[in-house]
From Swiss-Prot:
InterPro entries, alphabetized: RNA_methyltr_RlmE, RNA_MeTrfase_FtsJ_dom, rRNA-MeTfrase_E, SAM-dependent_MTases_sf
Primary location group: cytoplasm
GO cellular component, one term: cytoplasm
Function: Specifically methylates the uridine in position 2552 of 23S rRNA at the 2'-O position of the ribose in the fully assembled 50S ribosomal subunit.
EC number per UniProt: 2.1.1.166
Pfam families per the UniProt record, alphabetical: FtsJ (PF01728)
Organism whose genome encodes this protein: Chromohalobacter salexigens (strain ATCC BAA-138 / DSM 3043 / CIP 106854 / NCIMB 13768 / 1H11)
Protein name: Ribosomal RNA large subunit methyltransferase E
Gene for this chain: rlmE
Coiled-coil boundaries: none
Keyword Iron listed: no
Catalytic center residues: K165 (proton acceptor)
NCBIfam families membership: PRK11188.1
Compartments in which it is found: Cytoplasm
UniProt GO MF annotations: rRNA (uridine-2'-O-)-methyltransferase activity
Length: 210
């Protein structure tokens, strides 16, 4: 089926932006799997998220940009469990669970992979397939971060942290309030590597208390 000229132009515009992106170019040079690596590096530099020996869950992990950073930071005595609906090439020090995180079976596989360990940091970079229609995309995005928070509540150690990509829009304020009910402190971050036109921000919740 032929695509419309508008779709073709939009795709061409996205590709040009992607290949011109300095973080994309840096990721090739530095050996990182995606430009998203720089978001986590910046957040870690500011908030000291990752330390040797930590147990970390990475949701929405493919192609592995965050897991790559996390595995390096937590070291051999740490543990990184990553999950995504998409395939992800193996990474040393990372246990990967492939599947749809909205399905109970995938959640159970993540819990099994933990082998009884409590988690120090749950990270979610999940996002739905965007249609460009806020009325559809925003509820789907909020549903994913709600599920991520549910997992964090099940697995975090007391005092643990939760980092999630959230899109500003309907449901954002209510979600922020919900986070504040389970954590001592919640801050909003917008990494430099996050595209300026994007509605995405990262909420960092610290001091989990249930």
């Amino acid at each position: 089926m032929a695509r419309s000229s508008h779709t073709s132009k939009s795709s061409a515009s996205w590709l040009k932006e992607h290949f011109d992106d300095r973080y994309v170019q840096r990721s090739w040079q530095d050996g990182y799997r995606s430009r998203a690596s720089y978001k986590l590096l910046e957040l870690d530099a500011k908030d000291a998220l990752l330390k040797p020996g930590m147990t970390v869950i990475d949701l929405g992990a493919a192609p592995g940009g965050w897991s790559q950073i996390a595995a390096d930071k937590v070291g051999d005595k740490g543990c990184v469990i990553a999950s995504d609906i998409l395939e992800m090439d193996a990474l040393a020090g990372v246990t990967f669970v492939q599947g749809d995180f909205t399905e109970m079976e995938v959640l159970e596989q993540i819990l099994v992979a933990l082998e009884g360990r409590r988690v120090d940091l749950v990270m979610s970079d999940m996002a739905p397939n965007m249609s460009g229609m806020a009325a559809i995309d925003q509820p789907q995005a909020m549903y994913l971060v709600e599920l991520a928070l549910d997992l964090a509540r099940q697995t975090l150690s007391p005092g643990g942290r939760f980092l999630a990509k959230v899109f500003q829009g309907e449901g954002f304020d209510a979600y922020l309030k919900e986070l504040r009910g389970s954590f001592r402190k919640v801050v909003t971050r917008k990494p430099e590597a996050s595209r300026a036109r994007s509605r995405e921000v990262y909420l960092l919740a610290e001091g989990f208390h249930g």
